[in-house]
Amino acid sequence: MDHDDLLGAYRRLRLLREFEERTRLEFQTGQIAGFTHLYAGMEAIAVGVCEHLSDEDKIISTHRGHGHCLAKGCDPAAMMLELWGSTDGLCRGKGGTMHIADFSRGMLGANAVVGAGAPIAVGAALAASMTGASWVAVSFFGDGATNIGSVYEAMNLAVVLKLPKIFVIEDNG
């Protein structure tokens, strides 16, 4: 990475942290309904991975998906509108904080079920393999998902079929 790449990565790190700080404040004042799980403190993981992905590559996130969305290039204003429940949000206000997605950026969605993104991302990787597409699928999940059977089944299938798949385990606890 050259100086400009490093500066761009730093700016994305700051964007992720500032977005999470704003999200925390909006949640505390009741502007964001339901639950919210912040990604603050883990920004370097998402930025470090997504920095090396193409626009065509796909990602699947967790219930802590804001950072992954932003690192993949999703629009922060549209994301905040989504968290507020606005019909102008990324998912028309229906996805909220734990189910946010932006297919146009390769963000196939966040999933509130622990470990559920790994098999979904393997399905995306299988689609790439079967159609001859050149993109890879990345699933992010926390260390708590490493005791979920479907995560290991997804890993096994990805290896057996030699799929274009990356598993990112985040120590978030």
Segment roles from a protein language model:
Residues 1-8:
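Charged, compositionally biased N-terminal leader segments and the immediate start
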Residues 21-25, 29-161:
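Cofactor-binding active-site loop characterized by glycine-rich and histidine/acidic residues
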Residues 169-173:
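Thiamine diphosphate
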